[in-house]
Regions:
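Class I SAM-dependent transferase core
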Residues: 2, 11-69, 98-118
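Conserved SAM/SAH cofactor-binding pocket of Class I
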Residues: 54-140, 148-149
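A short hydrophobic/small-residue beta-strand
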Residues: 90, 161-162
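Short alpha-helix immediately C-terminal to the canonical SAM-binding loop
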Residues: 99-101, 169, 173
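Short "lid" loop at the C-terminus of a central beta-strand within the Rossmann-like core
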Residues: 123, 166-170, 193
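A short SAM/SAH-binding and catalytic strip from SAM-dependent methyltransferases
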Residues: 134-147, 153, 162, 167
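Helix-to-beta-strand junctions that scaffold the AdoMet/dcAdoMet cofactor pocket
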Residues: 155-157
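SAM/dcSAM-binding transferase cores
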Residues: 174-227
């Protein structure tokens, strides 16, 4: 089965409509007892979770072959839809143990053998699995500069960070450029999409050099004392 969407004037087709919809059903059901998303209706979920996640498909396919991590994954967006569509080995990362337990249930129910989870801080993952990832995604998680610092130690050389954003101020972009030079990351792609009246932006940063400072820094410093 295929699911189609109209976003950029082109019709695109996805092969796994049943799995994508079943994931959303599971999210809405789980959300009745545990707050894993602010989106509670089917219609909003299809647009703001499923279709929004799939906007990142081209960016993920442009990354090198290898493991993919979705950091701050929450209900599994964009990680689960992108794992379903690409078949990449995927790690869903969240610091909230309860959310990760729910994600484990989703993965089992959906039969996703290419997907696993990590409950913990991104900095800890960076220490444990440095340079292990070809691609990382982050959706509405933090400022670009913080995401660059957190993702750089996880990425192998040539690997990419894919940032899902709504509005991005020029100041944030400029600061990210400065921090990128410190952590070995460079902007290589910047796409804007219209999705059901919402403006969405997907920025891809590539790891092009070793960081000039020791990363990851102590847990929490990226947010408390940003570069």
């Amino acid at each position: 089965k295929y699911v189609s969407r109209e976003t950029t004037g082109q019709k695109e087709w996805f092969m796994h409509e049943d799995l994508l919809k079943r994931h959303l059903e599971l999210v809405i059901e789980a959300n009745k007892t545990t707050n894993i998303t602010r989106i509670s209706s089917w219609e909003d979920g299809m647009v703001l979770h499923v279709q929004d996640s799939l906007l990142g498909l081209d960016a993920l396919n442009a990354c090198p072959e290898g493991r993919y991590a979705d950091i701050g994954t929450g209900a599994g967006y964009p990680g689960i839809p992108l794992a379903i569509e690409t078949g990449r080995p995927t790690l869903l990362v969240d610091s909230v143990q309860k959310k990760v337990q729910i994600l484990d249930g989703f993965i089992e129910e959906l039969g996703l053998e290419n997907v696993s989870t990590y409950a913990g801080r991104i900095e800890d993952l960076g220490r444990e699995q440095a340079g292990q990832f070809a691609a990382i995604s982050a959706r509405a998680l933090s400022k670009l500069s913080i995401l660059l610092e957190l993702s750089s130690p996880l990425l192998k050389m040539g690997g990419r960070l894919i940032c899902f954003k709504a509005l991005v101020e020029q100041d944030e972009l400029n600061h990210a450029r400065v921090v990128g030079k410190q952590v070995g990351m460079e902007l290589v792609d910047d796409q804007t999409y219209e999705l059901d009246g919402y403006s969405r932006r997907i920025l891809s940063y590539e790891k092009v050099a070793k960081p000039k400072l020791k990363l990851p820094r102590r847990t929490g410093l990226a947010q408390k004392k940003p570069l």
